[in-house]
Amino acid sequence: MTKRPTRYYSKKQENLIAKELGGNRQPNSGATMFSKGDVVLDDWLIEAKTKTSPSNSMTIHREWLEKNEEEAFAMGKQHSALIFDFGDIHYPQEYVIITLEEFKKLIKGE
């Protein structure tokens, strides 16, 4: 069986997130000069990370979070988040990482 390229899984995840949140998937995963991130909402820039096969763990790099925050600011977005999954199609659960400050705003309804 031929293994699909990483891009296949990333694009699938990005499309799912965009559909679920009512946003738009960025072409080429935001690799252009002015369009960054993977999924864009009105006030949010989303970075998406997935595994190509089921896993029990996921390494989160600080660089991913910091870069997404910087790109969100540069694009005039008020919020940034990293959404990831463990690559398991039988348990397709997505998880969201935001700062504690963002979380406080959400629970206070700000």
Q: Model-found features: residue ranges?
A:
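Catalytic phosphate/metal-binding cores of nucleic-acid and nucleotide-processing enzymes, i.e., regions
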Residues: 1-110
